[in-house]
Amino acid sequence: MKEQLRACILKGIEGCFADGTLTSGEVPAINVEKPAHAEHGDFATNVAMQMAKQQRKAPRAVAEILVAKLAGASDLIESLEIAGPGFINFFIKDGAWRRTLSEIDRAGDAWGKSGIGRGKKVQVEFVSANPTGPLHIGHGRGAATGDAVASLLSAAGFDVQREYYINDAGNQMNTLGLSGLLRYKELLGEKIEFPETCYQGDYMKDIARDAVTKYGDRFLKVSQEEGVAFFSKMGGDLILAGIDQDLQDFGVRFDHWFSEQSLFDEGKVNSAIEEMQAKGLIYEQEGALWFRTTDYGDDKDRVVVRSNGVTTYFASDIAYHRDKFARGFDWVIDVWGADHHGYVPRLKSVVQGLGRDASDLGIILVQLVSLLRDGVPVAMSTRSGEFVTLKEVVDEVGRDAARFFFLMRRSDSQLDFDLELAKRQSNDNPVYYVQYAHARIKSIFDTARERGVEPLFDSVKFELLQTPEDLSLIKKLSVYPEILEGGAVNFEPHRITYYLQELAGEFHSFYNKSRVITPEEPELTQARLFLLHCVAITLKNALTVLGISAPERM
């Protein structure tokens, strides 16, 4: 609807240029927004205020000229009014709103989708947890966010690839190997002083037990270096397989798993450093190599290779992002924990050093999750330092509830996740409230058929949908494509959870005030069934893009 209105306003402005009522000139970007109060119309624009200086007229005078041109010029517009310093308020005809229902029915599963990203290739890299332990709930929020952003971008027409970056080249892998070896020796009877720097979780004992079952005491007889290398590989593989399974159980599947170690094995770290040196962006000082990130607004230059010759994580990130763009992605999106916010300027510097625009790298920061039970905080970790895992949360509340709750707030704001609320089958539980709306509609259709009313949608009389509840529900349906597009380009899946709760609220309000199946008014019955058919399509599409099911019975 907004796009149609923008086109109408543009045509009106061009008409005023043509007839001389306005001086020809550049047309500003036409903003069309929904007013805060319904009495100010369905939409409003400030275009008259934007054009006033160019036209050398008062904003209200420009608005009067435009209103005169637009009045009666479109079958969208019922009436117009000028408000305040020069806003133009639009009241849309009921018939124009009702036409949305035919669009929804025709589009079906494609309702809401757009082609704004057509021809553009995007990579979303998310989770990317070290393969040194199971995923915790913070990773779960990152997984839900990254997966939903990828789905939103796909719905907006982008060609999207989901990628997991395996941090398998750092010192943490040696620590993992040592942890596994010590637990293995302990299990075979050796008295071990287990260092605090090693991984404390019980999963390390599981890895050791697996090694004993498969290999007996073989690794008691090898050097520590060989034992650490073995348990680093075995432990990493087992943990990564567990991570993959937990993510699949959570509804997340990656198109590509990328090993950090492969960057070293294939010489990509060295070649990336050499390229940046050739560009004058990496220099030597005190035996170390530094990247000139201050050239791009960072507060200080960053070390790439230490004076002892050991590369930093930053060196891997330079090579990794160089590799991403070399694979042909137009847009690269990283999903990080909020504790990495200080890392943003240096990565933006790398992207610019590669000759790309800083905006070609999108970074989504994901804040912490606090667990509650009926409003009371839950301990997030055990005495041994094990965090509550994603698997534990999904097993307790279910995949749908977990995903919805993780996506209920902006990713960069802290999230309270109430486990008891997430399990509650009541309207207090937002995911239940939304899913129940979909199931309730399916139940209404079952009831209609039981009463001998078969939905017949080939000649629906939409004009019978005229109550405030009818029209309010239709208006809420009509904004879904705009919500979806905004969620995609701004990386904000919480816009969809907000919208779903609002749409479910409109539906439940409609249902409580309106009779759907009215035997004495068969045409109105068919019109309202069609309206609910469109609500069900929209609920299902919006839930699906978040990776959440739309149950037909609850």
Curated annotation (Swiss-Prot):
One Pfam family linked to the record: Arg_tRNA_synt_N
Signal sequence coordinates: none
Keyword Manganese: no
Chemical reaction(s) catalysed: tRNA(Arg) + L-arginine + ATP = L-arginyl-tRNA(Arg) + AMP + diphosphate
Cellular location(s): Cytoplasm
EC number: 6.1.1.19
Chain ranges for the short sequence motif 'HIGH' region as given in the UniProt record: 129-139
Gene Ontology biological process terms in this record: arginyl-tRNA aminoacylation
One GO cellular component term: cytoplasm
Keywords: Aminoacyl-tRNA synthetase, ATP-binding, Cytoplasm, Ligase, Nucleotide-binding, Protein biosynthesis
Disulfide bond residue pairs: none
Molecular function, one GO term: arginine-tRNA ligase activity
HAMAP family: Arg_tRNA_synth
Subunit structure: Monomer.
Similarity annotation: Belongs to the class-I aminoacyl-tRNA synthetase family.
PANTHER family for the chain: ARGININE--TRNA LIGASE, CYTOPLASMIC, ARGINYL-TRNA SYNTHETASE
UniProt name for this protein: Arginine--tRNA ligase
